[in-house]
UniProtKB/Swiss-Prot annotation:
Coiled-coil residues: none
Entry similarity comment: Belongs to the prokaryotic/mitochondrial release factor family.
Entry keywords, A to Z: Cytoplasm, Methylation, Protein biosynthesis
Post-translational modification, as annotated: Methylated by PrmC. Methylation increases the termination efficiency of RF2.
Subcellular location per the Swiss-Prot or TrEMBL entry: Cytoplasm
Entries under PANTHER family matching the protein: CLASS I PEPTIDE CHAIN RELEASE FACTOR, PEPTIDE CHAIN RELEASE FACTOR 2
GO cellular component: a single term: cytoplasm
Protein name, UniProt field: Peptide chain release factor 2
MF (Gene Ontology): translation release factor activity, codon specific
Residues bearing the modification N5-methylglutamine: Q251
Amino acid sequence: MDFETQVVLHNLKKSVEVIRRQLDIEKKHSRLEEIQALVDSPTLWEDQSRAQLLLKEKSQIETSLKEFKELSIQLDDLIEMIELASKDHEEETMKDLERELLLLKEKIQKKEIECLFSGEADGNDCLLEIQSGAGGTESNDWAMMLLRMYTRWAEIYHKFQVQIVDKVEGEETGIKSCTLKVMGKNAYGWARTETGVHRLVRISPFDANAKRHTSFAKIFVSPCIEGEINISIDEKDLKIDTYRASGAGGQHVNKTESAIRITHLPSKIVVQSQSSRSQHQNKAEAMQMLKSRLYEIELRKKEEKLNAARNVEDSIGWGYQIRSYVLHPYQMIKDLRTGHEVGNITSVLDGDLDSFIIATISNNS
């Protein structure tokens, strides 16, 4: 076994021990026993909301314990196999094991990042909103590119489920706005640092003179609320509009005014839903979205970051950019908060975002 491999294995053992402490494995086992006792109670379903939350927490703890156990076993087994292959001078076997070691290293690093998700809503599902900036067709097309990027990131790289809650098509191409519901373990924790303005520089495919254009779109991520939360919304503070849900080219999703748009006047937050044919269901979905947005603001207040949250929400422009995507005259995607850069723009636009997210989370931790 060469010295470099020894160092990697030593560091991975340290990382697994750090993960053990951060996850507080012993405490999780104790909590699991407590929940099991509550679940076994005959009065469990007298409060259905509480019962569902308990069962979800139980499932999350079981998954966390299982993943950590598998990670520990994989590392122990790999160390043993590497030591045997090194002792017997099996070079081909060592090459295969080194490839496995790299894959395990990535998995352990990802788990270390997940351990940094200490916010009270980091484990929740989330709403990811995309809104095109000024610029019409150019910005609408950029917003559509971001929709594809985030959908692939969620579904392919994290195996999250993605549901389109609301989508407004552009007049010629692309989208004016779209709201995604991203569902999965730590969905909000992974997505929350994407809130901000994203800038694209490229040769426009819509310009006959092939001139360079700059487009903007903003992303806003808020946690989905689980159970009841103390968010007070006064009916007199709401402006509720109904409209027909429709797509590009006049292709109506349905012919009745079932889509709902709610404006929260004090905060100027606007939410809308057209995912259902039922106006009642769309209103309930929109109200849940509004609560999530207001909850996000409360979380930001606790972290003394309210100004950043509202500035991002209210402004699209140079001042609040978090990431620049340059396709011409050179190719580079750069995060302006951390300085992290990636030259493989195709990979990033195809959903390979984790290096940016990890850099930002690590920088903030």
